[in-house]
Amino acid sequence: MANYTSAPEDDYDVFIEDDLSNDERELCSPYDPQALLAQLVPYLFITVFLVGLLDNILVVLIMVKYKGLKQVENIYLLNLAVCNLCFLCTLPFWVHMAWHEGDPGEPLCKILLVLYSVGLFSEAFFNVLLTVQRYQKFFQMRGFFSATRMVAGSIFPSALVWVIAVLVMLPELAFYKPQMENQKYKCFFGRPLFLPADETFWKHFLTLKMNILGFLLPLFVFVFCYVRMRRTLKFGERGYDLFKLVFTIMVVFLLMWGPYNIALFLSAFNEHFSLHGCESSHNLDRSTLITKIIATTHCCVNPLLYVFFDEAFRKHLYHFCHLCNDTAPQPTEEPAQGTSREEPCLSTKM
C-alpha cells in the first residue's frame, strides 16, 4: 500500500512544480512590439523600399547594359542586387500589417518568410563568394583561365548559392506556424520567423543556424581573406579599388546584421545568461526588434556604396542619367561592351 501511494505523490509533486514554473512565466506578460512597429516601421520601410527599389534596379540595368557580365565580380554584384530586390518585396507587406494590423493569411506569411530568408542567406553567401573570388584573383589561383571560362565558371556557384539559400530556409518553412492574436492569424515582423519556438531544441537550432550561416561564416571568411590580402596588396595597385569596394560591402553587411545576430542569440539562450526576468526579457525583445529593423534597411545600402567606391559604376550612372535627360540620345556614344577600356578616358571627366 505504501509503494502504491508514494509513486503518485512523487508524480503529483513534479506536476505542481511544473505548473508553478509556468504560472511564474505567465506573470511576465509578453513584450508588445505593436506601438514601436506602428511608429517606426511604416515611414522607415516605405523610404527604404522606394530608395532600394530604385537604386537596385539601376544596379541591374548598369551591370547588364554598361559594365557587362564579362567579369565574375559583376555577375556576383548583379546577384546581390537580385537578393536585395527579393528582400525589398517583403517591406510593403510589413508596412501594411504594422499600420492596419490586418490578417494576411497563412499562405502570404509563408511567401514573406521565403522571400525574407532566401534574400538574407543568399546575400550572405554572395558576399562570401565575392570575398573568396577577390582572394583567388590576388593570389592568381585562377590566373591561367580565360575570361570567358572564368565567367562560365561563376554561373555554377551562383546557381548553387540560390539552391543552398532555399535549402537553408526549408526548416523555417516546415516548422512555421502563424501566431494567434484576437482570434486572427498574424505573421509578426517583430518576432523571429521560426515559430513554433516553444520547442527549445528548434529555437536553439534555428538561432544557431542564423548566427553561423548568416553572420559567423561571412565574418570568418572576410577576416581570413582580408588579413592574407592586406599583406600583399598595396595602395594604388591594380585591383585596389575593387578590393576596397568588396571590403566595404562586407564590412557594412557585418556591421548592420551583427547586432541583430547578437540580440537574437541572447534572446534564444537567455536562460543560460541569467536574462530570463521580465525586464531582461522585454529588453531583449525590444533590442531584437530594433536591431532587426536596422538590419533590414541594409537592402538599399549596397548601391550607394557602388556610387562612393566604384568609379566605373559612378561614370556609367552619370552617362545613364545623361541619356535619360537627353531628348535626342545617341546610343553609339556608349557601346554596351566598351566599359573597361574606356574607363581611363572617362575618369578624366570626373
Swiss-Prot record:
Its main location: membrane. The keyword Nucleus does not apply. GO terms for biological process: calcium-mediated signaling; cell chemotaxis; immune response; inflammatory response; positive regulation of cytosolic calcium ion concentration. Residues 1-43, 96-110, 171-204, 266-288 are extracellular. It is a multi-pass membrane protein. GO terms for molecular function: C-C chemokine binding; C-C chemokine receptor activity; CCR chemokine receptor binding. Residues 329-350 are annotated as: Disordered. Disulfide bonds join 109-187. GO terms for cellular component: cytoplasm; external side of plasma membrane; plasma membrane. It is found in: Cell membrane. The keyword Membrane applies. Residues 65-74, 132-149, 226-244, 310-350 are cytoplasmic. Glycans are attached at residue 3. Keywords: Cell membrane, Disulfide bond, G-protein coupled receptor, Glycoprotein, Membrane, Receptor, Transducer, Transmembrane, Transmembrane helix. Receptor for CCL19 and chemerin/RARRES2. Does not appear to be a signaling receptor, but may have a role in modulating chemokine-triggered immune responses by capturing and internalizing CCL19 or by presenting RARRES2 ligand to CMKLR1, a functional signaling receptor. Plays a critical role for the development of Th2 responses. Lacks the conserved DRYLAIV motif in the second intracellular loop that is required for signaling of functional chemokine receptors. PANTHER family: C-C CHEMOKINE RECEPTOR-LIKE 2, CELL ADHESION MOLECULE. Belongs to the G-protein coupled receptor 1 family. This is Chemokine C-C motif receptor-like 2.
